[in-house]
Swiss-Prot record:
One of its GO terms (molecular function) is phosphoadenylyl-sulfate reductase (thioredoxin) activity. It comes from Shigella dysenteriae serotype 1 (strain Sd197). Pathway: Sulfur metabolism; hydrogen sulfide biosynthesis; sulfite from sulfate: step 3/3. Its EC number is 1.8.4.8. This is Phosphoadenosine 5'-phosphosulfate reductase.
């Protein structure tokens, strides 16, 4: 696999970019997660960043990538509406793994947003998308720009939802390379990795949560529910960071 030219690839239409990365992705599918991270560090341009929502299984990608690329900036987009357990989990993992945490927030506070727009998450898909644009997408775009990111690692997995089922290991999103080292891992592999390295699930895992985001748009899993139905009232799965 040869080195890739980000600028040249960004000039191509999306379909052509996918085709241009197809051969590389075929080779990356044969590597394990650690091998994919190592390949990216050898063949893709820096600066490198890792994003995390500090959700249920976040410790896996945080540990895996940080072990191979110590001190990599870890981007968290904080909406101000995370569970108290999430904030404590962030503190715990940041200390345990010695993370180089970079927290980004909307330019408007949560209280100001509610005064201006009301509770956007109660305003259907359109309201949720506006909320996500303000609190997730814009802060992430700002983070990528300020950190001069050219390669972005994330912990998405195909098993998590239909919207992620066909994602490749390597893509281009928001003008940068995006690498998903554990994209093909199943829940059993996640569990085994956590056990092997003495890591924990998010505290709310034990209370029946399969996915954790904001307090107002996260539900406990119930029998007959798909995992994606536990977020955004089942109206959508993605918060906007991993779309487009």
């Amino acid at each position: 696999m040869s080195k890739l030219d980000l600028n040249a690839l960004n000039e191509l239409p999306k379909v052509d970019r996918i085709l241009a990365l197809a051969e590389t992705n075929a080779q990356l599918e044969k590597l394990d997660a650690e091998g994919r991270v190592a390949w990216a560090l050898d063949n893709l341009p820096g600066e490198y960043v890792l994003s995390s929502s500090f959700g249920i299984q976040a410790a896996v990608s945080l540990h895996l990538v940080n072990q191979i690329c110590p001190d990599i900036p870890v981007i968290l987009t904080d909406t101000g509406y995370l569970f108290p357990e999430t904030y404590r989990f962030i503190d715990e993992l940041t200390d345990k793994l010695k993370l180089n945490l970079k927290v980004y927030r909307a330019t408007e506070s949560a209280a100001w947003q509610e005064a201006r727009y009301g509770k956007l998450w109660e305003q259907g898909v359109e309201g949720i998308e506006k909320y996500n644009d303000i609190n997730k997408v814009e802060p992430m775009n700002r983070a990528l720009k300020e950190l001069n990111a050219q390669t972005w690692f994330a912990g998405l997995r195909r098993e998590q939802s239909g919207s992620r089922a066909n994602l490749p290991v390597l893509a281009i999103q928001r003008g940068v390379f995006k690498v998903l080292p554990i994209i093909d891992w199943d829940n059993r592999t996640i569990y085994q990795y956590l056990q092997k390295h003495g890591l924990k699930y998010h505290p709310l895992w034990d209370e029946g949560y399969l996915s954790v985001g904001d307090t107002h748009t996260t539900r406990k899993w119930e029998p007959s529910m798909a995992e994606e139905e536990t977020r955004f009232f089942g109206l959508k799965r993605e918060c906007g960071l991993h779309e487009g």
